[in-house]
A protein has these predicted regions:
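Flexible "arm" and connector segments at domain edges
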Residues: 1-127
């Protein structure tokens, strides 16, 4: 993940888009822009899926990753995001049922099993 975050950091530097030293420096305008960019790419993904366009799907997913990595930088999480992701994965795996099988809702959403626990992200961030 760090390789790709560094690539986006290079882009930010080349295009004079400095990343804040503290996530609290991110303005409402800046985080709303990040949200709009992701929303645009989500819509492009949906459209590409509807047209069975694998190139468009790959492009939209790649652009989403690019925006996500940039957003990670904007919030100063580049040094902790892998640990955060691992903790979320650990929590997601705790959703299995007592029999070790997934518990699924009718629409395919995975439900929380009896052993589910929330990810402890505050521990990672020291918050």
């Amino acid at each position: 993940m760090k390789k790709y975050i560094n690539m986006v950091a290079e882009f930010h530097t080349a295009f004079n888009m400095p990343d804040p030293q503290d996530y609290k420096q991110l303005t409402q305008e800046q985080y709303e822009l990040r949200h709009r960019l992701l929303e645009e790419e989500n819509n492009e993904y949906l459209e590409a899926c509807g047209h069975d366009d694998l190139v468009g799907i790959a492009d939209a997913l790649g652009d989403q990753l690019y925006i996500i990595y940039g957003t990670i930088l904007k919030h100063g999480l580049q040094d902790r995001i892998e640990e955060v992701f691992s903790e979320i994965h650990r929590s997601n795996m705790s959703k299995l049922g007592e029999d070790g099988l997934p518990i699924m809702r009718g629409d395919g959403k995975i439900l929380k099993g009896p052993g589910y626990f929330k990810p402890d992200i505050s521990k990672i961030l020291g918050a």
